[in-house]
Amino acid sequence: MTEPTRAGGTPPEAPWPSAARGWLVVGLLALASIVSQFDRTVINLMVGPVKAAFDLDDTHFGMLQGVAFGVFYVLACIPIGRLADRFERRWIIGTALLLWSLFAMASGLARTYTQLFLTRVGVAVGESSLTPAGFSMLSDHFPPAKLGRPMGAFMMSSPVGQGLAFIGGGQLLQWLSTSGVMQWAPLAGFEPWQAAFFIVGAPGLLLVPLFFMIREPARRGPGGEVPMPVREVIGVVTSRRRALLPMFAGFAMVPVVSYAIAIWTPALFQRTWDWNPAQIGWGIGLLQLTFGTCGAYFGGWLTDRFTRRGLLDAPLKAAALGFLGCGLFGGLAPLMPTAGLALALLGPALFLGNTPYACAGTAIQLVIPNRARAQVTALYLTIINLMGMAVGPVVVGLMTDHLFHDPQDIRYSLALVVAVTSPILFVLLMAACRPYRALRGTAH
């Protein structure tokens, strides 16, 4: 792994990379994100068989995503973000993609809960590289006024991946369970859920060489000349704390909602309306592919539109306005008397719930020096995921087990968690707007 060929910062007046080159990088990052969503999401369709295989309750299953994935994802973010600010980001992403794909496949070999827990840790550590390094790369391919849409396109790959994982994963599990393919020699002795891990982990290996082949972009803007010592990065954060603290706290509400919905909605439909994995996959997957995908891109589009109107705090206002309705629709959806009505409300909840992701990435890149961007992005991911992946999935499980005392009452747990979060985000992001505007006025 070497320093970027053009490690010196690029003067602001130098030409930006071509749009074609920039969007090629967006496409590769999006494909890697789709693969990562498959690897992390397909387990949500395996609640029943995984709990049965390892004799788990809802709390312990929630820990597979909340602790094994969420906590270790965030623990790895900052060290990997540090590497991404010092070395070539294409090598960071390519190597991590190789590792997380292998760990995803190894999840199917787990014979104990501890082994499965550790393989999910490996997936989390690998996937923690993609967003910090990816955001940093995009900020060196697109000028600030045009950064929102590429960020939105990158972020829309997350609901695309989740949607495809629900649809494809549900169909895959159904096929593995009913077709007799599990009697074939390579799969004999394994359960369908184990074979599914082997299959969904493999495609990531095909993308690895492509990242090694792309060109590393020149680092642009303030702070791009040489790697920053850790103390200077700390200074960057502390000097911007009046904006960053409420920003990060507000954006932490987004994964609380998204992971609670992604992990527990399949169980909601199975327990409440007796849907099988294929039905769940098609129902939720199509909503993710349509509403979730459009919402993620809409956040980037709205940010660029607000920016063109002269709003220096455009990313924050776009996120706050978009997410405000998520709590309403998402809180009501689990309480509906029929599955059809629940899906009808879940669609706009996913649209609005995915809006802030591109806004957050854009907001950070616009006020942070170049050689600190991946690290500050990693800090952002650490904070939001400690509140999100480590709290959302586990709290829903804990409330179901210990507050309502009935697995059928998961609808109330999910509704409460979703409904409480969106007004908190709105208040915190509005509080961050004034100090953020001051930073935008001096960032470049």
Which role does the model predict for each range below?
Residues I43-N44, R242-Y297, N354-Y357, G361, ...:
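Extracytoplasmic gate region of multi-pass secondary transporters
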Residues L75-Y113:
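Conserved MFS/SLC helix-loop-helix module at the cytosolic interface between two early adjacent transmembrane helices
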Residues P11-S18, E216-F248, T272:
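Juxtamembrane intracellular "pre-TM" segments in multi-pass secondary transporters
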Residues T119-P159:
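Cytoplasmic helix-loop-helix junction between adjacent transmembrane helices
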Residues D55, E88, L109-Q115, G126, ...:
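Helix-breaking motifs and short loop linkers at transmembrane-helix boundaries and internal kinks
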